[in-house]
Amino acid sequence: GQVDITVTPDKETQAQLALRIPGWTPKATVTVNGEEVQGVTTGQYLVIDRKWKAGDKVSLAVDMPARIVRLEQFVAYERGPVVLARDSRFNDGFVDEVIMPASTQNGTPTLTPATPMPGTWMTFTTPVIHGTYSDRQCDIIQMHLCDFASAGNQWDEKTRYRVWLPLLYEPMYKGGTAINGYW
């Protein structure tokens, strides 16, 4: 994501601009009028002290990685600062069914942008192991997620949504270690 700020003082002014660099991003870049600013640290403020004139442009570019947050036998998905939810309007399964995230690299989930459903701002698909225990291999499906702010906004009793998704119980799970290629 990127945020652009245009400075518009009435006259050239010496001042400090403090930008909060989000802690959830692994990488952030700040430029002033196209020149990169050094000393950018995630999770802290970056103070730019200079003479500002009308039209100066400050840009903050951040990576917005997908993340999985685990709590006991539940997981939640996030992308940058946005919490995602499973919404029954996608008709891709019961929102309370157990899943197991399928990971790609170092436990990072794959979130693929999908065509937004009417009434949603962001929509993604992600591969998950679907189903309950059996003697056969469980299927991997593409589960839909949307931004939490849009989840369930139909205001009817039929629509259900969920942020904390129940996990397929994995007795071999040890502190986030991937097992057989799955998280």
Stretches found by the model and what they are:
Residues 3, 15-19, 53-62:
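Short, well-structured beta-strand segments within conserved domains
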Residues 12-32:
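Beta-strand-rich binding/interaction modules
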